[in-house]
Amino acid sequence: MAAAIALLDEEGVDGLNMRDLGQRLGAAATAVYWHVSSKDNVIALATDAVWAEIAVPPAPRPGMWRPSAEAFARSAYDMVCRHPWLWPAISASFAYGVGMARHQEQTYAIFQAAGFEGRELDGAVNTYSVFIFSASQGVAAAFALRARLKRSGEDAQHLMAELNQRAEAVATAFPALRERMAAHSHAPLSDDDRFAFGLDVVLDGLEARLRKSRALARKTEPTAGQ
């Protein structure tokens, strides 16, 4: 499976073929089919395997769930950035296996330890997970474009320069956008910086939500003697 993952990392889902995989393994494509029935099966197996790369943090101590959530989010984000073909593969094949399920179980454990329950727990896990994997979409889009240009033989650097020029031309009609694009051209914000900022905002919001839920629960508790 390591050879398939490495090939996907280089070529993406559309660039994967059994002949190239066989060459990496030192075998004919027909021999590969003895082990996996199809390209879709290879993608499904590779998709499930990469989830194991996410480092599982220790069980959070009472009141200390946030460091676990931060470490788990960072490891998940890094994994998806290493394998930017993952989400296109999931979307194309509806792949859902033990690896992804285990990741979801571990995410629930972190937010259960924080004190979320019921629908609040579901909402916290969903908000956290959607942010992590949405944050990687820029990396995935850039990878898909590079892979497509590589297959077509186009000059990626020249095309990106043209796209940036077009974006700047469009932005001139929008003052706030024009100002921020100019600022970013001098001091660009890295993908990691954007991720760290967004994760802080999400976890700040979830902490505030948890405090609000607890305060509401205290208000609705029956008083002594009732």
What is the predicted function of each stretch?
Residues 2-6, 10-11, 41-57, 67-75, ...:
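Alpha-helical structural segments
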Residues 3, 7-41, 45:
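Helix-turn-helix
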Residues 46, 50, 54, 132-136, ...:
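Hydrophobic recognition helices of helix-based DNA-binding modules
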Residues 47, 77-99, 105-106, 137-145, ...:
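Amphipathic alpha-helical segments used for helix-helix packing
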Residues 56-102, 118-128:
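Hydrophobic alpha-helical connector segments
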Residues 106-164:
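A contiguous pocket-lining binding segment that forms or flanks enzyme active sites
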Residues 141-226:
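C-terminal peripheral helix-coil segments that are non-catalytic and often amphipathic
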